[in-house]
Amino acid sequence: MVVRSTAAPPTPWSKDLAEPKIHESAYVHSFSNLIGDVTVCEHVLISPGTSIRADEGAPFHIGAATNIQDGVVIHGLEQGRVVGADGHDYSVWIGDRSCITHMALVHGPAYIGNDCFVGFRSTVFNARIGDGCVIMMHALVQDVDIPPGKYVPSGAVITNQQQVERLSNVTEADRAFAKQVVEINEALREVSPGATNNGSRIAANQQPTPSSSTNTSGTSEHQSVGNMSLNGDLYNQVRGLAAQGCTFTAEYANKRRFKTKSWLSAGFVEGHSADQIIGNLNRVLADHAGEYVQLIAVAPNSKSRAAEIVVQRPGDSAPVQTSTTASYSNNGNRSNGTSAGSQAAAVGGDLTSQIHALASQGCSFTAEHANTRRFKTQSWLSAGFVEGHSAEQIITNVNGLLGQYPNEYVQVIAVDPHSKFRVAELIVQRPGETGTLSTKATASARRSGNKVVNTASGGDVAGQIAALASQGCSFTAEHASTRRFKTQSWLGAGFVEGHSANQILANIQAIAAQFPNEYVQLIAVDPNSKTRAAEIIIQRPGNNAPVQTATATSSFSGGTKAAPSSNGFGGHSSGSLSGDVVSKVRSLLMQGYKIGTEHADKRRFRVKSWSSCGTIDSTQEAEVLRHLEGCLQEHSGEYVRMIGVDEAAKRRVLEEIIQRP
C-alpha cells in the first residue's frame, strides 16, 4: 500500500501561518517547498529540492533576481531577528542579485546583502554578510559580522570577529566564478518542465495566495543566460582550458531535447590553440543554427568534464569572437588553414598536420559519411577503411572518398592501435564544400618571400609556442650550415626572449634573418628537468632538407612530402634514417639514455612478439646512427623499432617504429 504524506509536514508553528507572497515574475519550481511568511521578489529563481520554511522563525525576504539553487535549506529560530534593508525585522533577509548555491544552509537569524555568493554546502547562521561578499564551498560563518566585499575561502570556519579581520578582499576571478555558477543554474528558468513562473509548491495545510496564478509572465526569461558566443570571456575560458591540456567536444539540442537535457553529440572540436578551437566551434554553430549548442571541455587526466559552456541558443546568430591577434605567418597574413572564413575544412593545413601526427603514432583510419538529415542525429554511415602506410597515402585515399560523397558530411576516424578506441574524429568535408586535403599545405608559401618557414597552419605554431610558454619553458635558438646540419653539429644562437608566442616568434624571425641560407631551429627547454621539450626547425636554405622536429606535432613545415622510399613512419626501407629519428636519438643520448632496437616480421608484429637486436653500447651520436642504419639494412622487409632505455630506473622511455615493410 502506498503511504502518502504532505509535501511539508505540519509543525507546532504551522498553524495559522501567513501565506507566501510571490511576485508574478518569480520562477519557483514545483518541487520546492515554501511555507509561511516568505516574500519572493521579482525575477527570483527557486530551484527544485529547496526548502524555505518560515514556520518557526519569520518573516523571510528574498530579494530581486536572487538565485536559490537545488537543495538549499532556509530556516529560522523562533527567537532572534535581523534588521533588513527596509528597516523592518526579519528572521532571514537575502538581498538582491545574490546566489545561494547547492545544499547551502541559511539559518536565521541571518542577513545576506546584495550581490553575495554562498558556495556549495556552506552554512550561514546568526551572522550578517555585507554586500558583494563571496563565501566559497563547505564554509561555516557563525556569530560574526562580515563587512562588504570580503572573501571566505573553501572549508573556512569563521566564528569570531578576529578571523573576519584577516579575510581578504574579493577579486575579479572570484566574481567571474560566481557569475558562471549563476548563469548555468539560471538556464532552469526556460528548460525545466516542472516549473512555472509563480507556481510554488505550498504545504498541504495552506492554500496558495490569489496572486499565485499559473499564467506565464512575459518576463520569465529576463534573467536567462544570454548569448555566450558574444561574450569575450569565452575566448579566455577556452584559452585557459586549452592551456591545461583539455580536449573539446560539442553537443547540440533543439528546444524539446534541451528541456530534457537530451543532448546530441556534434563531435570533437579540434585545435591546438584557442583561435583554432573557436574557429572550428563557429562551424558547429553554423551547422546547428537555431538550436542550443554547448562546448564541453574534458580534463586530460580524469577524463571527466571540466566545463560545460552553452555557446548558442535559438535566435542567436553572431559567431563566437576570437582573438584579434593575427596568427604568425611568413607573409604577415593569417593562414588560410585557420581563418574563420576559409573554404572547406578539408583544405585546412591544420587537418593535414593532424593526420600526419596521428599516422606517426601508428593509428589506423576509417571514414564515415552522412547527409544533412543523418548528420543532425549523428547517424553516420561507414565508408570503409582508409588504407595507407604514410600520411600522404592516407590523405590521397581520403580525397578519393570526398569525390564519392559530394554534398555530404565526411569524417575521418583515427583508431588507437592498442586500445582500439577512437582518438580523433575529423570532419573533412561539409555540404557545399569542394576542397581536398593537401599533402603540401604551405609549399608555395615557403617558396616565396623570406626564408622563415611556418607550419601548415600559422596559428598552430603560435598555439604550440603559447602552450610551451604557458608550461614555463624557456627558449633558445641554434643555427647550422648545410654541412653542419648533416652531422647535426648545431651552433648556439642565444636565448629567445619573450613573454608571449607573438614576441617569441618575432624574435626568432629576427635571429633567422641574421643567418640567411642556414638552418635555424627553436629549442624549448623544460624548466624542471632542464631537458629539451621540443625542437622546431623554422628556417632552411632550400626545400630539399628533411623535416626535423622532436615531437610528431611540432613540425614547422608540416607539408614536406616523404621521399618515395620512405615508409611514412620515420624509417626508410633503404636503411636511411629520417631527420625526426636523428633528432630523437640525439635527445635520448643527451639525457643519458641507452638506445636499442627490436625487429619483427608481419606475423610476429600482429601478436606484438618482438625480437631484440641488443643494446647499442656507444654514446656517440654518429656511431649510434650507424648501428641503427645497419639494423635497418639487416632486417629489411621487417618491422624495426627503436627503444630508449633508462638504465637507472630499469624502464623504457621510448618505443618508436622506425621501419615498416
From Swiss-Prot:
It is found in: Carboxysome. Residues 578-661 are annotated as: RbcS-like repeat 4, SSUL4. Residues 194-204, 319-342 have a biased composition (Polar residues). Residues 205-220, 549-567 have a biased composition (Low complexity). One of its GO terms (biological process) is carbon fixation. It holds the Pfam family RuBisCO_small. Disruption phenotype: Single gene deletion does not form carboxysomes, and does not grow in normal air but in 2% CO(2), called a high-CO(2) requiring phenotype, HCR. Residues 456-541 are annotated as: RbcS-like repeat 3, SSUL3. Residues 350-431 are annotated as: RbcS-like repeat 2, SSUL2. PANTHER family: CARBON DIOXIDE CONCENTRATING MECHANISM PROTEIN CCMM (PTHR43360), CARBOXYSOME ASSEMBLY PROTEIN CCMM (PTHR43360:SF1). Functions as a scaffold protein for the assembly of beta-carboxysomes, initiates carboxysome assembly by coalescing RuBisCO (ribulose bisphosphate carboxylase, rbcL-rbcS). Produced as a full-length and a shorter form; both forms are required for correct carboxysome assembly and growth. Belongs to the gamma-class carbonic anhydrase family. This is Carboxysome assembly protein CcmM. It comes from Picosynechococcus sp. (strain ATCC 27264 / PCC 7002 / PR-6) (Agmenellum quadruplicatum). The lineage of its organism: Bacteria, Bacillati, Cyanobacteriota, Cyanophyceae, Oscillatoriophycideae. The gene is ccmM.
